[in-house]
Design a protein with these regions (language model features):
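Non-catalytic interface/targeting segments
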Residues: 1-53, 60-61, 80-82, 89-119
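Conserved residues at the C-terminal ends of beta-strands
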Residues: 69
Length: 119
């Protein structure tokens, strides 16, 4: 299983960036192999539909779960269509959020928690 966290930097020591579509990076952990790596969120460069572009990026990297602060309706729909589970309303360091996820201490989102464009 691959878990991605929207991040302000490229390591597990960096803070979560709460904006799914506009975060700089995703730190990805493969729970099977234990491998960790970061990808640049090229979706953030979109002039519109950054959340959808970001969902496509995560799908292309075979992500199963994404942990973030906020997700809008278009991004949530795209993530749901890609069968990527979404956990929102989080904050803190990437490593702490991954630990909370592994321990079952994060709540799966049932829908978007912000309006379009982060409003």
């Amino acid at each position: 299983m691959r878990v991605a966290v929207s991040a302000s930097g490229q390591t597990q020591l960096d803070e979560l960036n709460p904006r799914l579509g506009r975060c700089e990076y995703f730190v990805i952990v493969d729970d099977v192999s234990g491998e960790t790596w970061a990808i640049e969120n090229t979706g953030r460069l979109s002039t519109g539909a950054a959340g959808i572009a970001t969902a496509t990026l995560l799908h292309n990297h075979q992500v199963d779960v994404v942990i973030t602060g906020n997700v809008g309706p278009n991004a949530f729909t795209a993530l749901e269509a890609a069968e990527i589970k979404v956990y929102t309303g989080t904050k803190g360091k990437v490593q702490d959020l991954l630990e909370q996820y592994r321990n079952g201490n994060l709540s799966k989102a049932s829908g978007p928690n912000v309006g379009p464009h982060g409003s």
